[in-house]
């Protein structure tokens, strides 16, 4: 996909990024140029941002997307908060990269999962998620298409055989169609 389309799809989005590592947050801000990224270094700080009142109208803060670390910030608990508020969520991980955390992310409603080693590709990855949402398609099909070989290398060949029915449906182009509100650029 041409870079200009990626930039235009992301431009103006408000994103909540949560990670306990300041350098990761700095990278997220740099990679997501053209967006407004609110950073939080802890679960409590993220929850406060989610609950904060918007300046105009007194409504809750609105985010178009959340990018959450799984480990250091209670990311799986925070995932339930963002999904419960209709915020599309991408999970990041370095240390928790295993089939169990991937499955838990899917079950709890994350729309994508990205190893931190792929952080430089975050904008393209989010663009894929947004495009899938716009086309009422499963973002997970794209995740597995993009990262399936990396998962195989990390988890070992045949890792999906422990639960083949579960994994086959998330690789299907029709499964997991997005039912929350799509990101807006307002």
Could you describe each region identified by the protein language model?
Residues 66, 71, 79-100:
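A short, hydrophobic beta-strand element within the central beta-sheet of small alpha/beta folds
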Residues 27-32, 104:
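Alpha-helical interaction/dimerization surfaces of two-component signaling modules
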Residues 53, 60-61, 81-88, 108:
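Conserved phosphotransfer cores of two-component systems
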Residues 46, 75-78:
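Short alpha-helical interaction/output segments
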Residues 77, 84, 96-128:
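Alpha4 helix (beta4-alpha4-beta5 surface) of REC/receiver domains from two-component response regulators
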Residues 131-186:
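C-terminal output/effector regions of signal-responsive regulators
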Residues 22, 39-65:
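Acidic, metal-coordinating helix/loop segments flanking the phosphotransfer/catalytic sites
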Residues 6-23, 27-29, 66:
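Conserved acidic segment of CheY-like receiver
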């Amino acid at each position: 996909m041409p870079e200009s389309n990626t930039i235009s799809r992301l431009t103006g989005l408000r994103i909540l990024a949560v990670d306990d590592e300041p350098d990761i947050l700095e990278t997220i801000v740099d990679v997501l140029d053209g967006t407004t990224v609110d950073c939080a270094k802890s679960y409590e700080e993220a929850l406060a941002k989610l609950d904060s009142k918007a300046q105009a109208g007194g409504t809750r803060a609105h985010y178009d997307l959340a990018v959450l670390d799984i480990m250091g910030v209670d990311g799986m608990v925070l995932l339930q908060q963002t999904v419960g508020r209709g915020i599309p969520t991408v999970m990041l991980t370095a240390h928790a990269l295993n089939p169990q955390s991937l499955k838990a992310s899917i079950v709890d409603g994350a729309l994508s999962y990205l190893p931190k080693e792929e952080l430089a590709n975050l904008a393209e990855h989010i663009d894929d998620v947004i495009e899938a949402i716009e086309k009422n398609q499963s973002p997970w099909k794209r995740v597995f298409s993009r990262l399936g070989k990396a998962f195989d290398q990390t988890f070992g060949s045949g890792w999906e055989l422990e639960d083949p029915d579960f994994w086959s449906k998330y690789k299907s182009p029709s499964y997991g169609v997005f039912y929350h509100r799509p990101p807006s650029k307002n």
